[in-house]
């Protein structure tokens, strides 16, 4: 999957599935789907996340995350990331077929 930095834009249409990615305390990449989110300011996202998710716990510990958006070509992989918990399947990103690299901007993985 190719990556593209869209920069700060004031809209998200059609409504995407946001994929929030973090590192855990051991540096392992994790991600979750966030369907409840959108642009609240021209350069700011608002997301509704449950504290019970491992990804959210990672985010609260590290203070860093990245946001990717699902595309039609990767529906099955993105669905897997949203259904399976890293609490039970620690390597769920690789099992989904995704690879990650470290973000150049924050201490979090980019899918």
Model-identified regions with their sequence ranges:
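Active-site-proximal mixed secondary-structure blocks
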Residues: 1-32, 38-111
């Amino acid at each position: 999957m190719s990556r593209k930095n869209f920069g700060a834009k004031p809209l998200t249409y059609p409504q995407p599935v946001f994929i929030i990615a973090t590192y855990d305390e051991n540096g392992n990449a994790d991600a979750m789907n966030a369907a409840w989110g959108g642009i609240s300011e021209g350069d700011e996202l608002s997301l509704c996340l449950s504290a019970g998710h491992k990804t959210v716990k990672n985010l609260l510990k590290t203070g860093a995350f990245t946001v990717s958006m699902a595309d039609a070509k990767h529906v099955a992989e993105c669905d897997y990331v949203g259904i399976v918990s890293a609490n039970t399947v620690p390597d769920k990103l690789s099992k989904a077929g995704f690879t990650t690299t470290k973000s150049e901007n924050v201490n979090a993985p980019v899918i």
